[in-house]
Amino acid sequence: MINYKNLNELENFKILEGIAPEVLKTALTGKRIKEYDITIEGDSVHYNYASKQINENHLKIFQNLSDEANLIEKYKEVLNGEKINISENRKVLHHLTRGQIGKDVIEDNKENMREFFQSELEKIYNFAKQVHSGNIKSVNGKKFKNVVQIGIGGSSLGPKALYSSIKNYAKKHNLALMNGYFISNIDPDESEEVLNSINLDETLFIIVSKSGNTLETTANMQFLINKLKSNGIKEYKKQMTIITLKNSMLALEETGCLEYFFMHDSIGGRFSPTSAVGLALLTLCFTEKIVKEIIKGANKTDKKSLNKKVKDNAPLLAALISIYERNVLNYSSNCIIAYSKAMENFYLHLQQLEMESNGKSVNRFNETINYKTVRIIWGGVGTDVQHSFFQMLHQGTDIVPMDFIGFNATQLKEDVISDNSSSNDKLKANLIAQIIAFSKGKENSNKNKNFKGERPSALIYSKELTPYAIGAILSHYENKVMFEGFLLNINSFDQEGVQLGKILANQILKNNAFEDEVIESYSKKILKQD
C-alpha cells in the first residue's frame, strides 16, 4: 500500500540527516566524473552529478528513501489517472500529451484522454499546414508571417522558453516559417511595443487562458482588439485563435475565431508546454517536424523516469539530491546556468515550475509542516553571469548549488578562430572551468583571493541543443519537481498562493470609496497620485 508520510517521518530521511556531505576537493576525480553520469532519456542527453556533495553511502540511502516513500509507485498513480491533485480533486495528465505510458485514462466515463490530447495536436498540425500553404490568410488577404501569443504564467513562460531554445536550430534547418512573439504583462507598454514592431496585416494571434477570464490576458486581448480596429482590421476574429477549456467564458463568448484548441483542467499551466498551450505556436513557427521531436524527447524521459533504481533515473536522483541540499545541508536556493544563449528564458520557466509547484507550507492533508520545502530558483546565461553574480557564488557567505547546462556544438554552425580557439571552445572551456573552480576552489594566504570551493553543481549536457534534447530536459525538470513534491508530501499541482493577490487587486479596482485605510493610503500614493 502506498504511504503518504511527511518527510521528517520517513526513517531513511532521519538517517540521511546524519550523513555529512562529500568533500569535493578530494573526491572529484576523472573516474568519478565518468561513473557519476547517467542519461536522462536513455540515449544522448546526460545528467552528471560528479560535482555534487554525495558518495555511494548517500546513494544507498537515497535508494532506501525512494523505496520507503513509494516514489515510483506515486508516479505510476499519476500516469494511471489517479486524482493526485487532491485539493482540486483533479487528475494530473500532462504526461499524456506526449504519449501513453500508463493505463487508459477515461474522463467522465466516456472520453479517452490520450485520444483527446492527440486529436487536439492533429488539429494544430492541420491548422498550421493551412496557414503555411496560404489557404488561411489575414483579413486583408496577406499571408501570415508572425504569431503573437497572449497569455501569462504557464501560458507564456514555458512556450517562450521552448521557442527561444529552438529558434536558431529551426532557422539552420530551414524550418523557421513564422516569427513568434509573446505578450504577458498587463503593463500596456509591453503590448504597445510588441504590436508596433510587427505588421498587423501579417500577424496571427493566439489567446491563451485556461479559465477564460484571466485578468491580464483579458485586458491584453482588449488592447489587441482596439489596436486591430484602429488599424482598419474590423473583422479581427479572423486573425485570432483561442486556447482554453471547452466550456470557458472565452470559448463560449468569443465565437467566430479562426480556430479553437482545447486544454483540459487536469493540466496546470506550468506543466502545459507540451499541450496546445505550447505546441500551437511552435508548430506554426517551426512545423510539426520540430514539435514531434520535442514530444519524443519528453516521452522517452517520462518512460525512463519509471526506473526504480535511483542511479539510473536522473529526475529521481536530482530530486533526492535537492531534498538533501535543502533539508539537510540547508542550502536555500538553486542557480540554473545554461551556457547557451538560446536557453536564456529557460530558467524563468523553471522558476515557475518549481516554486509554484512546491512553494507550500501544508502537506497533502492540509496540515502545517515543520520542514523546508522549495528552494529559490534563479539563474542566467553563461558566460554573461560570470561577470555579474558569480562573485557571490564563489566567495559569498551562502553556498548555492548550481545546475549547469551545456552543449558540444552550436545551433547556427558559424564561428571564428581567435587566439587558436573558436568562440564555442571558449564557451565550453569557461563552463568546465567554473565547475572545477566551484568544486575545488583555490587556497591562497591572502584571504581576499582565497576560494573555499565545496560549491556543488550538476551538469546536464548533450551534443547539441536540438528539439529532442530540449524535450528531454523539459521532462527531466518536470519529473524532478514531481518527485520532490512526493518526498515533501505536498500537493505540487495547485497554486492557492496566486489567488489572494488577484482578489485584493479586484477589490482595489472596484472600491472607489476605499473603506480600508491601508488600501486607501497605497492607492493615493500609486493609483491617484494625490
Swiss-Prot record:
Cellular localisation: Cytoplasm
Record's PROSITE patterns?
P_GLUCOSE_ISOMERASE_1, P_GLUCOSE_ISOMERASE_2, P_GLUCOSE_ISOMERASE_3
Catalytic center residues: 356, 387, 502
What cystine linkages occur within this chain?
Answer: none
Query: Do the record's keywords include Isomerase?
Result: yes
Q: What is its main location?
A: cytoplasm
According to the UniProt record, one GO cellular component term is: cytosol
**Record GO terms (molecular function):** carbohydrate derivative binding; glucose-6-phosphate isomerase activity; monosaccharide binding
Which EC number applies?
Answer: 5.3.1.9
Q: Where is the signal peptide?
A: none
Reading the lineage from the top rank, the first entry is: Bacteria
**Biological process per Gene Ontology, one example term:** glucose 6-phosphate metabolic process
Catalysed reaction, written as an equation: alpha-D-glucose 6-phosphate = beta-D-fructose 6-phosphate
- Keywords recorded for this protein, A-Z: Cytoplasm, Gluconeogenesis, Glycolysis, Isomerase
- First-level EC class: isomerase
Question: Pathway of this protein?
Answer: Carbohydrate biosynthesis; gluconeogenesis; Carbohydrate degradation; glycolysis; D-glyceraldehyde 3-phosphate and glycerone phosphate from D-glucose: step 2/4
What role is this protein assigned? Catalyzes the reversible isomerization of glucose-6-phosphate to fructose-6-phosphate.
Q: Which family does it belong to?
A: Belongs to the GPI family.
Q: What is this protein called?
A: Glucose-6-phosphate isomerase
Q: Where does this protein come from, organism-wise?
A: Borrelia garinii subsp. bavariensis (strain ATCC BAA-2496 / DSM 23469 / PBi) (Borreliella bavariensis)
Q: Source taxonomy lineage?
A: Bacteria, Pseudomonadati, Spirochaetota, Spirochaetia, Spirochaetales
From the UniProt record, report the name of the gene that encodes this protein. Answer: pgi
